[in-house]
C-alpha cells in the first residue's frame, strides 16, 4: 500500500514556493470573494487601483482587478497539483449595489473559467 502524507498549509496561496510542482493531490481553499464588501480592504491593500475603482463606482473594473489578484492563486494551485489532482474551491457569488446599479457579480463563472483556461476540467455537480 502506498503511503500518503496529509499536510495542512496555512498562508498566502499566491506564493507556494515551498511546495514542489506536481506534488499535491488535493487543494481546498476558501478565498476572499470579489465584490463582497467585507473583503474590499484585503483586495485594496494588495492593489490600490481597486479602492480607486470602488470609490469611482466602477464595479466592472473592481471585479476584474480583484480577480486578477486571485488568478495568481489559481496559477499556483495549477502548478502544485499532480495530474488528475483536485482543486476544491469554496466560491460565493456577490450581489451588490455600485452607485445606482444593483447587480450580480458572478464569481463562480469567473473562477471556473480561470481554471479551464489553465487547462483544468470542471467536475460535475
Outline where the language-model segments fall:
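S-adenosyl-L-methionine-dependent nucleic acid methyltransferase catalytic domains
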Residues: 1-125
Amino acid at each position: 500500500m502506498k503511503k500518503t502524507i496529509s499536510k495542512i498549509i496555512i498562508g498566502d496561496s499566491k506564493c507556494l514556493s515551498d511546495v514542489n510542482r506536481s506534488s499535491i493531490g488535493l487543494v481546498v481553499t476558501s478565498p476572499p470573494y470579489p465584490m463582497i464588501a467585507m473583503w474590499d480592504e484585503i483586495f485594496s491593500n494588495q492593489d490600490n487601483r481597486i479602492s480607486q475603482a470602488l470609490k469611482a463606482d466602477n464595479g466592472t473594473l473592481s471585479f476584474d482587478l480583484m480577480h486578477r489578484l486571485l488568478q495568481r492563486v489559481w496559477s499556483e494551485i495549477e502548478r502544485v497539483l499532480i495530474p488528475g489532482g483536485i482543486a476544491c474551491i469554496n466560491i460565493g457569488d456577490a450581489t451588490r449595489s455600485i452607485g445606482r446599479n444593483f447587480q450580480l457579480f458572478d464569481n463562480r463563472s469567473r473562477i471556473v473559467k480561470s481554471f479551464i483556461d489553465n487547462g483544468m476540467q470542471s467536475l460535475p455537480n
